[in-house]
Amino acid sequence: KKHVKVDLKELTVAPYYGCQLNRPWGDIDDLQHPVMMDRLIETLGAGVATNYSAKTICCGASHMMPYEKSCLPQVRRIVNDALAKEARAISTVCPLCQFNVDAAQSGLDLPDMPVLYFTQLLGLAFGLGEKDLQLKKLLVPFKIAI
């Protein structure tokens, strides 16, 4: 907490655990209702999207390429739930989750929902800039207007 330099209180984040963060099952956090990332986001000073029910559903993982039509409803639910909770961004630690949820939005006709790596959120709180955090590499843009 002592390293936080930027006030993120205006930023509400939907913590997206996906299906892999809790593996090995239950050893790190509660399998059905994890809170580890929620608490870390709160420690950074950002708001947490409460009752974000999609936070543990699978994004489609490696099935997104061969079975895209089956996976898109899952991404739709992940994004719609974050939008319903008034989140301005989704945060995840999984590279495949980040890519799937970020890239799949272009075909879903939904309002844009940026998907940040948790480390990018850390960087924002610690005062790193857009260039340092490679925010322009995200497919759904995220602006640092905090």
Where are the predicted features?
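Iron-sulfur cluster-binding electron-transfer modules in prokaryotic oxidoreductases
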Residues: 1-146
